[in-house]
């Protein structure tokens, strides 16, 4: 009896049809041998490429009986045994989620140990398209996190870079926190940069953190820096929100300088300073050396006091402004009296003059508003005179009214913070101070009241003081000093700097390196200061501290009439989602 052999086409093609993309193997015996070597590996029947290899094997004349025998004998059922073991664990009472995490974590460890980027790249060369299993993988965070780790270790792997792009295309770019991973592809980097900028714009309570995150990514390399700054420069020209982008650009420049990255040539190229070669050369010289010198200051003064001054943006460089503020307000810096007015003029010009396009005239023509220039120069001069004299708290009291009048100018506020920082960070400052609140710190309260935008700087200074080692002081004196600093933080909180202050105190509670009596003191002061309604974020940060028995246990009475109980009852009644 003849056996009729069904030689219909592979995967449903009719007999006699061929795929024009398929070509016959040049050496059938060699192809068969290659396929047999693969079929001999354990559990090859479970491999994604099994159908491709079977097709090659049969087209080259391979024996069906032999391949069936090989695949059967080498079937170890590792995956099936893992599934069976997982089912047993579930039957034994282990939670499904725990079993799943157990299997996934073990599999991740195995992949991390045995991953071969060259073999991974062959996935695309063999299959010619994105495998379905890869598309399914990126839907799950567990496997996306694995891809991120592998991409950091193997930045040149084409398969991983392609997968990162797939992840970004799928909308998960906010998860890509590794800069080296994002910087490999412009599309991915652009999306991650956009997400970072949006976070900066939408998180006014954590501007510093958002800026640091964005700046770290932008400063990853020259290509990321130039690309990002050009993009931000274009956005800064927009009428709506342009100033926010300009601030972001300047903060990125500051971050780069703090990390010893010389970005001055790029900055000068982007600000259009080439039209004013004298001013450009003078500023570049000082920025490159990170120090001011009278000759270059004189060149800038001559340019900006002339009839056709360069754009203000040229000297609104963060590094240059930092150098000017340091020169005029940091104790111990000596400036030649002949050149001092030039320093003051440039600082006042950069902070007080308004440069805007003239109405009904070409965009290239600018209109300068110098109404506040003279008064700003006078305020800087008066404040500089007070700050430049080495005087204690008692002598300073006589100058307070004059100083408070000068502080109304934002640039003077910045300078005064710099001066106070230089004074109070001296190790002997609190040892010599006998006041319950030193005059210098009282001046900080005034700056915080007048300039909300400087509150973050003041908080950073207070945090440094709070965490500073005051070993020369007795323990009780140290506690009183820290209570006084906490009073300054409470003052900041009442002025609107609420979330940053509470986040810091919450961090102190979490680390447990702060005396609990200080946390209790802070909570007491805040409870005496605040009243409802409260924002959900305030309750989320402050309520756990108030509920903490270790902190407020001794502050509670028998009833609900004490401030602690009243706050807790009110929050429980009105903030059920917290």
Curated annotation (Swiss-Prot):
GO cellular component, one term: NELF complex
Job of this protein: Essential component of the NELF complex, a complex that negatively regulates the elongation of transcription by RNA polymerase II by RNA polymerase II. The NELF complex, which acts via an association with the DSIF complex, causes transcriptional pausing.
The encoding gene: TH1
Protein name according to UniProt: Negative elongation factor D
UniProt keywords, alphabetically: Chromosome, Nucleus, Repressor, Transcription, Transcription regulation
BP terms from Gene Ontology: negative regulation of transcription by RNA polymerase II; negative regulation of transcription elongation by RNA polymerase II
Pfam families from the UniProt entry: TH1
Family listed: Belongs to the NELF-D family.
Molecular function via GO: RNA binding
Stretches for region Disordered: 1-28
Keyword Repeat: no
Self-association and partners: Component of the NELF complex, which is at least composed of TH1/NELF-D and NELF-E.
Subcellular location per the Swiss-Prot or TrEMBL entry: Nucleus; Chromosome
Coiled coil, from the record: none
């Amino acid at each position: 009896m003849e056996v009729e052999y069904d030689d219909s086409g592979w995967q449903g093609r009719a007999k006699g049809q061929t795929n024009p993309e398929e070509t016959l193997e040049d050496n059938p015996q060699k192809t068969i041998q290659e396929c047999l070597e693969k079929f001999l590996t354990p559990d090859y029947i479970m491999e994604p490429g099994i159908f491709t290899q079977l097709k090659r094997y049969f087209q080259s004349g391979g024996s069906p009986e032999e391949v069936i025998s090989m695949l059967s004998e080498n079937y170890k059922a590792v995956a099936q045994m893992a599934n069976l073991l997982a089912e047993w664990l579930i039957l034994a009472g282990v939670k499904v989620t725990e079993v799943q995490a157990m299997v996934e974590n073990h599999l991740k460890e195995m992949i991390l140990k045995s991953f071969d980027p060259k073999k991974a790249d062959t996935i695309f060369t063999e299959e010619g398209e994105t495998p379905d299993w890869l598309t399914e993988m990126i839907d799950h965070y567990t496997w996306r996190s694995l891809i991120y780790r592998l991409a950091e270790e193997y930045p040149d792997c084409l398969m991983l870079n392609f997968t990162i792009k797939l992840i970004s295309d799928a909308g998960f770019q906010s998860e890509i926190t590794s800069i080296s991973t994002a910087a490999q592809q412009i599309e991915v980097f652009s999306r991650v940069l956009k997400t970072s900028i949006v976070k900066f714009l939408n998180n006014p309570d954590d501007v510093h953190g958002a800026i640091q995150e964005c700046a770290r990514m932008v400063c990853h390399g020259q290509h990321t820096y130039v690309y990002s700054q050009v993009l931000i420069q274009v956005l800064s020209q927009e009428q709506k929100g342009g100033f926010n982008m300009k601030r972001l650009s300047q903060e990125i420049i500051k971050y780069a300088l703090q990390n010893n990255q010389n970005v001055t040539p790029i900055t000068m190229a982007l600000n259009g300073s080439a039209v004013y070669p004298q001013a450009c050369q003078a500023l570049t010289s000082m920025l490159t050396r990170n120090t001011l010198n009278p000759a270059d200051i004189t060149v800038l003064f001559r340019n900006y006091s002339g009839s056709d001054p360069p754009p203000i943006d040229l000297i609104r460089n963060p590094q240059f402004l930092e150098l000017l503020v340091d020169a005029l307000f940091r104790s111990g810096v000596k400036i030649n009296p002949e050149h001092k007015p030039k320093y003051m003029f440039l600082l006042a010009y950069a902070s007080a003059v308004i440069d805007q396009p003239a109405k009904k005239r070409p965009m290239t023509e600018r209109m300068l508003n110098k109404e506040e220039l003279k008064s700003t120069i006078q305020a800087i001069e008066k404040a500089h005179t007070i700050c430049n004299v080495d005087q204690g708290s008692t002598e300073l009291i006589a100058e307070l009214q004059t100083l408070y009048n000068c502080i109304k100018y934002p640039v003077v506020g910045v300078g005064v913070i710099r001066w106070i920082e230089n004074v109070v960070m001296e190790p002997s400052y609190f040892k010599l101070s006998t006041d319950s609140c030193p005059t210098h710190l009282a001046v900080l309260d005034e700056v915080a009241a007048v300039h909300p935008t400087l509150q973050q700087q003041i908080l950073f200074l207070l945090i440094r003081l709070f965490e500073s080692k005051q070993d020369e002081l007795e323990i009780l004196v140290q506690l009183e000093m820290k209570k006084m600093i906490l009073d300054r933080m409470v003052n900041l909180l009442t002025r609107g700097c609420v979330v940053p202050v509470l986040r810091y105190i919450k961090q102190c509670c979490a680390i447990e390196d702060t005396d609990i009596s200080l946390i209790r003191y802070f909570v007491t002061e805040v409870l005496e200061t605040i009243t409802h309604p409260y924002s959900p974020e305030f309750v989320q940060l402050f309520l756990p501290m108030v509920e903490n028995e270790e902190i407020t246990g001794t502050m509670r009475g028998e009833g609900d009439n004490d401030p602690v109980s009243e706050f807790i009852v009110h929050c429980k009644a009105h903030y059920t989602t917290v």
